[in-house]
């Protein structure tokens, strides 16, 4: 059975029809080289908060409370939005204390003309806290185009959806895609949370395919839980998303069960492997700006650059959104997620999950 992927975009509003010829005219390559797009975007924002040459801006239609610490923000993007597939995410940009900050959030719902972000407020979350306390219906939010490959294939749909905590957000979008397509296969959906009160989308989680396991013991996954609710889990292709503890436990279970059906996953929160401290300092040089700093530590390059007073572009900080990706011209880095070393020149690396193992030159 072929399942729908991209949803149709809505008809543009009168305002968008009027501004679109201007936008496309100004985006001629020659004009791009003459204009500072940032300044033009700022000018257009002053005329209308949804107007931009390059940025997707989204009107906040409504804000829905899901749990005590989770809200859903329903958005209508402007004419630059290219659509999305269930399971993908966007980067949300906000200005705080004079700096533009970016975080990656999954799309929990995609309908013609609207998308929804379901965001849990993190205890120390600068951006999530700002969105929860400040963002209201009628505001305008800057987002990226949809990104990510945690999407359903046209064939071989999943037989098991497994999530915990806020990992339910992309998984819920995948489930809705299946339901909207008329999928009549044998689907099971197991979600784990600390309590019923912590269950995101409680009002939408009816149906015979859904099993909710609430546990007071840290909301942790166990093999017994899976075996109890889904006895034939080994035979089910599985889509998985959740915090690091869930990801590690499930990946460990699948690794010890070679006959298990395929597992597809997206991680919420990076499980970084510690790199060994260096015996002597190494130099990290930025070839374009001329900036440089020395380090003997094993922290990601992004954190060390910020500690040295350098402001670098970044987003999720966990290796997902690739906002901090740059080209390594020379030197060796270690991927703190996989432990792999990369010494080849002119390779793309993500600063938030890369630690220097030698002198480095970065194209920044």
Model-derived regions, located:
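Local cysteine-cluster metal-coordination motifs and their immediate loop/turn environment
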Residues: 170, 310-335, 343-358
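Hydrophobic structural packing positions in well-ordered secondary structure
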Residues: 60, 87-90, 107, 138, ...
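Short flanking/linker segments adjacent to small metal-binding domains or redox-active Cys/His motifs
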Residues: 359-364
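Ferredoxin-reductase
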Residues: 44-140, 144-145, 157-158, 185, ...
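FNR/FR-type flavoprotein reductase catalytic core
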Residues: 2-14, 130-290, 294
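Short polybasic amphipathic segments
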Residues: 92, 282-287, 324-326
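C-terminal accessory/binding modules appended to enzymatic or scaffolding proteins
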Residues: 279-316
